[in-house]
From Swiss-Prot:
It comes from the Archaea. The keyword Cytoplasm applies. It catalyses: beta-nicotinamide D-ribonucleotide + ATP + H(+) = diphosphate + NAD(+). This is Nicotinamide-nucleotide adenylyltransferase. The keyword Coiled coil does not apply. It is found in: Cytoplasm. NCBIfam families: arch_NMN_Atrans (TIGR01527), cyt_tran_rel (TIGR00125), PRK01153.1 (NF002243). PANTHER family: BIFUNCTIONAL NMN ADENYLYLTRANSFERASE_NUDIX HYDROLASE (PTHR21342:SF0), PHOSPHOPANTETHEINE ADENYLYLTRANSFERASE (PTHR21342).
Length: 172
């Protein structure tokens, strides 16, 4: 059996890792969708699709998990989004999501949709991790060490801080 899960993975953290590991116990292969793959260089989505692929690939390298990583664009046309996903991915039977819109769209196309059990959601939140990065607080223990390495390699902290700078135009 093959399953699909989509996320923004901004950044890929230990909560995400635990969900992927749990799903891998239930299916033979996982298709990991890089959602909003066209978005990057914002405070909400600071990392590129390629950087997120590096994070996930390196973090999963030590586990015996069969997976594909597929970039998924936002198309702002919800009625056909599932068809777009299907055209980009290998076939799959089951969708794992905690997102109500994704659940609805795949349910309407008769997919089996499961809600993954979130792993310590209060502690493992991409939003909170990005806030900690911005404030100069400790964030490294929330992500796999391989993700720390990628973020340091690409100067992800510097990028987030530069994105938060107020432009001169903002004052007028």
């Amino acid at each position: 059996m093959r399953a699909f899960i989509v996320g923004r993975w901004q950044p890929f953290h230990k909560g995400h890792l635990e969900i992927i590991k749990k799903i891998s116990e239930e299916v033979d292969e996982i298709i990991i969708g890089i959602g909003s793959c066209q978005r990057s260089h914002t405070l909400t989505d600071p990392f590129t699709a390629g950087e997120r692929i590096m994070m996930i690939t390196k973090a999963l390298g030590r586990y015996n998990i069969n997976y594909y990583i597929i970039p998924i664009n936002d198309i702002d046309f919800n009625a056909v989004w599932v068809s777009c996903v299907e055209s980009l991915t290998p076939p799959f039977d089951t969708v794992y999501t905690g997102n109500s819109l994704v659940r609805e769209l795949f349910s309407e196309k008769n997919y089996v949709v499961k809600k993954p059990e979130l792993y310590n959601r209060k502690e493992y939140s991409g939003t909170e991790i990005r806030k900690k990065m911005l404030k100069g607080e400790k964030w490294e223990h929330f992500v796999p060490e391989e993700v720390v390495d990628v973020i340091l390699e690409i100067d992800g902290i510097g990028r987030i801080k530069r994105l938060d700078e107020k432009d001169y135009d903002d004052y007028f």
